[in-house]
């Protein structure tokens, strides 16, 4: 009798900053009991490693060394969510060698597990192009800026809405126009516009797609 290996069931969720993809990914992971990796945190962790050592953010060799020694299980979302770290992360994220190192680590995470949920900017296109289900979550810049603004206020920090909106638009342009792994939906991705959709509505839409894909995966 022939033996065969069942491919891991991977849910790939992509989208621009503050689109709600992370919240949706966590909701899906919790519902299905799947391990979750926020790949954006990996870039933030590299940036923090450089900042902690007082190293320059524009040195690709140093940033790549930090990426290669990164422990995915040691990342602290609360610490890495700081605005300054996010700004620093956007600088190291454009470095091809850093992206290659982190993509390899992210891919290993997904392929080493029976099932997983990964969210980021290039999961369905680069990290896990063979993912069982691909979602691309988007929302208007204004809606995303309002969400980010509310998040900052909820943490007890001060924020300027116009500044956050300008930063998001700048990040969108950088993400979509970079030569290595630009932000774009995979050809077979399901689009979810969360501009006027609650997280629960987005989850229910995603759940319907995932349940169908799971049934096919299990045969």
Curated annotation (Swiss-Prot):
Cellular component per GO, a single term: cytoplasm
Keyword list, A-Z: ATP-binding, Cytoplasm, Kinase, Nucleotide-binding, Transferase
EC primary class: transferase
GO BP: any one term: pyrimidine nucleotide metabolic process
Documented EC number(s): 2.7.4.25
Residues engaged in binding ATP: 15-23
Record Pfam families: Cytidylate_kin
Reactions the enzyme catalyzes: CMP + ATP = CDP + ADP; dCMP + ATP = dCDP + ADP
GO molecular function annotation: ATP binding; CMP kinase activity; dCMP kinase activity
Localization terms from the record: Cytoplasm
NCBIfam families, A to Z: cmk
Protein family membership: Belongs to the cytidylate kinase family. Type 1 subfamily.
Protein name per its UniProtKB record: Cytidylate kinase
Name of encoding gene: cmk
